[in-house]
Swiss-Prot record:
It comes from Broad bean wilt virus 2 (BBWV-2). GO terms for molecular function: DNA binding; RNA binding; structural molecule activity. The keyword Transport applies. The keyword RNA-binding applies. GO terms for biological process: symbiont-mediated suppression of host innate immune response; transport of virus in host, cell to cell. Pfam families: Como_LCP, Como_SCP. One of its GO terms (cellular component) is host cell endoplasmic reticulum. This is RNA2 polyprotein. Keywords: Capsid protein, DNA-binding, Host cell junction, Host endoplasmic reticulum, Host-virus interaction, Inhibition of host innate immune response by virus, RNA-binding, Suppressor of RNA silencing, T=3 icosahedral capsid protein, Transport, Viral immunoevasion, Viral movement protein, Virion. The record marks 466-467, 868-869 as: Cleavage. SUPFAM superfamilies: Positive stranded ssRNA viruses.
Length: 1065
């Protein structure tokens, strides 16, 4: 009979008996005064019915239950291997069987004597007969052992939690909740919600602390009490831990990840190792449960005792993105001691099984011949799981046979999954009890196979712990534990305060903090940070500025990573880089700003943050003047902390891919008067420089986007309210594609287009963000246009129109003012390669017609490779970007062309396009702009010098040759390239890999200790009168990477260029 049907019948029978009993009681009261005969009949019927009900219940419930107990005794028990190693709770009527595990440790052989507990077969004999030991005297086929050992820890792919209930792990009755409220000594059972543990980046190696309790509060015991009384404070006993690994790799990828859980309080791997699991890094999240038998006293923080070490393999995942998120759920007991709780058979079985498998997994050899079952199947051969670090340095011994190294002893260094190398593992199993025939010969390392660890294919482990003829070498050690466990007040680096005057203007600097001065401040951990070579994490700025809600002003805090000049300036376009935050103190009196000191690395250093003149800067400045100013100056306080656990994504862009958060652009500021309604149209083109009045600023976004012709991406518009939040209004933003902007005349037309409404309110964020998906734009968005005037819209893909739903109104005086910025989001795709347009550092005026002194004779060489067709990123290998140009001008040089005078002449230029050039006119192509706006760079650059001879000289009359040399630093440094052009006209080319001290990146435009200035080129003409033009071109190789943004380059126009176009409706 099925158990579910039996349970239903039992419930129905109990209800019938209760109804008969109540009916009998009611009839008894009714016939109490009638007759004795009725009472007798009522008793008889009741007893008769109860008799048959009890018989039926015994036959169908009690008898099967007793039969199940008898058949499940040890005499009749057979193991069901399908469910023997699972941690799933059993059914209602299913009996759980206990298991006994015995450990037999055979003594070593002594002088050839074989004891009764020695293995029956040697390792060589077992290899021949294809069998393996399971006890000292029993063997089974190796295939059977591998099949059963493969179910070490099953990673379950599920969208729901698989953590057992409290009732499955501890014996509880229905009065437990009431008893726990009345008694102080009653245990408290807690099942936590899902707690975020951390994330593993695409780099594929991380260590994470596993939180046991959601919020730890230390229980303080009176020191005056005896030890036995103080020891009875509440302990934390962890029954089960569920780890959830949510991978973000592509579903069709083979990226795998593995983790090892261990107790940090132990130093040996046998005591510390709690278990491991492996999973794929894509698809449905993987769940795995551990029963760690973990107890923590009241005086220790349980959230610092367990640690998870995660690694990934076969990963083509980008390091700047998150590969997997790790979270945990725990079931623990807070009690006075283990005697206060009663564990179920299920928990006892699971705990014992975890201990046995952990011991088998982390054996002395640390080599596992089987791995967890996975679906779908993934390749985990020779998977290297990190363990507690412990290595021994060995010194070389010089003999007449050569230099020999004693074998390094690896104790708890790593665990290897699915070892596929030689089956003969040193010091494993029965082999460690064999008598060594040639002890002296086996003592030294003669080949790779003689080493104790055979895991790493690159050979890093083979070289670990070996020295070459060194004696008395002292190793310097550092430990990051002190900075990682410090509280926030101890992590303070610098603090200060300032005032916001009443006469500020947009761009006024409120306060400036140069990061190269951090090492000189007397903070708590400054001395320790000065000692460390790499400080993990980021920096955080906390800012507090209290103003009345009737006031309003826009503020911005920005991190200027590459400050290439001693004069910081106050230009908003130059200082608002990739890492900044804008807010209104009337809405947000308290803000936090976290930034990455080195945008190309996950660490920073106190002594590599620039020099006295060229140091990275944290600057707080105004975005606007006071809008309804206060009566007195407002005060602002700030503090800088280091955050060792907060690791922001790297800001690294390649020619084929760039993260979306690196693309930002400041559009401008709009003001709306009260009682009026107006609409504005504007263009968001990240390939154009930022324009603010007469000032034009090139940023990393405009430089990188200038390399391409078209883009497809989501666009987010940020509206930061700078006026008082008590001045309100409702606005709409719509996108008008193509030339349809010319037909917009009323709100009805705008409402028929893709649009969204928004407003500002007090008590929320200062910024409203609106996303326009890329599906809204239809066609690709143009990037490589050069006309800065918004009135000329011939080559504009589309316009955004901002219009009012209602008139601005308030009891206060003034205008509603906000600042507009644009940024990209989601997956960005660039199409086509653009060689850019010939702008110069001396460019004045607006548009492409005013201020140009490029006469028709040099149009062709300057516009070399312009107007590319529809292209792919592979075209970067063929497109050359113009960098510098020289043209012969009559009467400018000594001598005369007609008299055939000879006058040598030199052209000099630094190859990053900076101002230190001589006789070369710098052409600001996308190549030059990108080199001048990125903070870091590494990769190969190619350069070409194209010379055109004058047609006035016949070939037989030429006496000149052109020599090109490239130097490491200045012209007084050594040359790394030298070439001679023997023909009248021709081309010379060379390449150079740019490297630097910070993870291989070179700092561009600012000083990092150990870096040097950029390369310089020298073009020497034997006779200047024989040449017409000399043009310098640059080209990117496919391995080029750019990181971060330094202070943007800028120039001024003759007249102001409007950004917004007013539309009256």
């Amino acid at each position: 009979m099925r158990p579910e049907l039996v349970a239903v019948l039992d419930r129905y029978f109990s209800e019938i008996i209760s109804c008969f009993f109540l009916g009998w009681l009611l009839n008894f009261l009714l016939v109490w005064f009638c007759s004795t005969k009725s009472t007798f009949l009522l008793w008889s019927v009741f007893l008769y019915i109860c008799y048959y009900i009890l018989r039926i219940e015994f036959a169908y419930i009690v008898a099967p239950f007793l039969k199940t107990i008898y058949t499940n005794s040890s005499q009749y028990h057979t193991v069901d291997w399908a469910y023997a190693y699972t941690a799933l709770p059993k059914g209602l009527w299913e009996q759980i069987t206990d298991y006994n595990y015995c450990y037999n440790f055979p003594p070593p052989r002594v002088e050839g004597f074989v004891s009764d507990f020695s293995p029956r077969f040697t390792l060589k004999e077992l290899e021949i007969m294809n069998e393996a030991n399971i006890t000292p005297v029993h063997t089974i086929p190796k295939d059977t052992l591998l099949k059963r050992a493969s179910d070490y820890k099953l990673a379950v792919e599920s969208k729901k939690s698989i953590l057992p209930r409290v009732q499955d792990l501890y014996e509880m009755d229905k009065w437990h909740n009431l008893r726990s409220k009345l008694s102080k000594n009653a245990p408290s059972y807690v099942t936590t919600s899902e707690i975020a543990v951390g994330a593993m980046s695409g780099a594929g190696n991380t260590k994470l602390a596993i939180p046991v309790v959601e919020k730890y509060t230390e229980e303080v015991a009176d020191d005056r009490l005896p030890d036995r009384v103080r020891a009875k404070a509440d302990q934390i006993m962890v029954a089960a831990i569920e780890l959830v690994a949510d991978g973000f790799a592509s579903v069709n990828s083979d990226v795998t990840m593995a983790g090892a859980l261990y107790d940090k309080r132990h130093k040996t791997i046998a005591s510390s190792f709690k278990g491991a699991f492996a999973s794929r890094a894509s698809g449905v999240p993987s769940h795995v449960i551990y029963f760690p038998m973990h107890r923590v006293p009241a005086c220790d923080d349980p959230n610092t005792t367990l640690e998870l070490s995660m690694v990934s393999r076969d990963s083509d995942f980008d390091e700047g993105y998150t590969l997997a998120n790790i979270s945990a759920r725990t079931l623990y007991v807070r009690a006075k001691g283990p005697e206060k709780v009663t564990e179920t058979r299920h928990l006892l079985k699971a705990k014992t099984e975890d201990v046995v498998k952990a011991r088998q997994f982390a054996s002395e050899a640390q080599v596992v011949f089987a791995t967890p079952r996975l679906f779908p199947e993934v390749n985990l051969d020779n998977y290297n799981l990190p363990g507690p670090s412990n290595a021994q340095q060995t010194e070389a011994i010089t003999t007449d046979r050569g230099i020999l190294f004693p074998k390094p002893k690896f104790k708890g260094n790593e665990v290897v999954l699915n070892y596929t190398g030689s089956g003969k593992i040193r010091n494993v199993g029965s082999q460690r009890f064999e008598t060594k025939k040639n002890a002296t010969g086996e003592q030294f390392v003669r080949s790779v196979d003689d080493l104790g660890c055979l895991s790493d294919e690159d050979g890093k482990d083979y070289r670990y712990g070996q020295g070459l003829m060194e004696e008395d070498v002292l190793n310097v050690q550092t430990n990051n534990f002190a900075i990682e466990s410090a509280t926030e007040t101890m992590r303070l680096l610098f603090s200060g305060y300032a005032s916001i005057p009443l006469n500020v203007i947009p761009g006024t600097k409120i306060t400036v903090a140069y990061l190269n001065e951090l090492s000189k401040h007397s903070a708590v951990h400054t001395g320790l940070l000065n000692m460390l070579s790499k400080i993990p994490g980021s920096l955080k700025v906390k800012i507090n500025c209290q103003v009345a809600p009737t006031c309003g002003i826009g503020l911005a805090v920005s991190y200027v990573e590459g400050n290439e000049s001693a004069n910081l300036g106050s230009s908003l376009g130059r200082l608002l880089g990739i890492q900044h935050y804008k807010w209104n103190p009337a809405i947000e009196p308290y803000v936090e700003f976290v930034f990455k000191p080195f945008s190309c690395a996950d660490w920073w250093n106190m002594h590599y943050l620039g020099s006295f003149k060229f140091a990275p800067v944290v600057v707080i400045q105004t975005l606007s003047k006071w809008l309804n100013a206060p009566k007195v100056d407002a005060r602002i306080s700030f503090a800088i902390y280091y955050e060792p656990t907060v690791v922001l994504p790297k800001q690294i862009a390649t020619l084929e891919h760039a993260p979306a958060f690196m693309f930002r652009k400041e559009v401008g500021t709009l003001a709306f008067k009260q009682g009026e309604r107006v609409a504005y149209s504007f263009e968001v083109n990240l390939g154009k420089p930022q324009t603010d009045g007469k000032e034009v600023t090139s940023t990393f976004a405009s430089s990188y986007c200038g390399l391409s012709q078209y883009m497809q991406s989501d666009v987010i518009l940020d509206f930061t309210l700078m006026s008082s939040p008590m001045i309100g209004g409702t606005f709409s933003i719509a996108y008008v594609a193509g030339a349809y902007i010319e037909k917009v005349g009323n709100m009805q037309i705008l409402d028929s287009l893709p649009h969204i409404d928004f407003t500002f309110s007090s008590g929320s964020k200062s910024t409203r963000s609106v996303r326009f998906p890329k599906e809204v734009f239809g066609v690709y968005q143009a990037l490589d246009r050069w006309d800065l005037d918004s009135a000329r819209g011939d080559d504009v893909s589309g316009n955004f129109v901002l219009y009012q739903r209602d008139a601005v109104s308030s009891a206060l005086e003034g205008e509603l003012t906000f600042r507009i910025a644009a940024r990209l989001s989601g997956d960005i795709s660039f199409t086509g390669v653009s060689a850019g347009y010939p702008t110069t550092i001396t460019r004045i005026g607006k548009g492409k017609t005013i201020g140009r002194s490029l006469d028709p004779e040099i149009r062709k060489p300057l516009r070399y490779m312009l107007g590319q067709a529809h292209a792919t990123p592979k075209d970067f290998s063929s497109v050359r970007f113009v960098m510098g140009h020289w043209k012969y001008r009559a009467g400018l040089y000594p001598g005369s062309k007609s008299d055939e005078d000879i006058h040598p002449f030199s052209l000099k230029m630094r190859l990053d396009g900076s101002k230190s050039s001589e006789n070369f006119e710098i052409i600001h192509s996308p190549f030059v702009r990108l080199l001048q706006n990125c903070a870091w760079m590494r990769g190969t650059l190619r350069f070409y010098v194209v010379a055109r001879a004058s047609s006035d000289y016949m070939s037989y009359r030429r006496t000149s040759q052109l020599t090109v040399s490239a130097h490491e630093n200045s012209l007084s440094s050594n040359q790394f390239y030298s070439g001679v052009l023997t023909s009248p006209s021709g081309e010379l080319s060379f390449s150079r890999e740019v490297v630097g001290p910070v993870d291989g990146f070179a700092s561009m435009g600012w000083n990092v200790r150990g870096s040097k200035k950029f390369y310089k080129i020298h073009v020497e003409m034997g006779n200047v009168h024989e040449y017409d033009t000399v043009v310098l071109y640059g080209q990117f190789d496919s391995n080029v990477e750019f990181a971060g943004q330094r202070k943007g380059g800028h120039y001024l126009l003759e007249k102001e260029t409007p950004i917004f176009k007013t539309i009256k409706y």
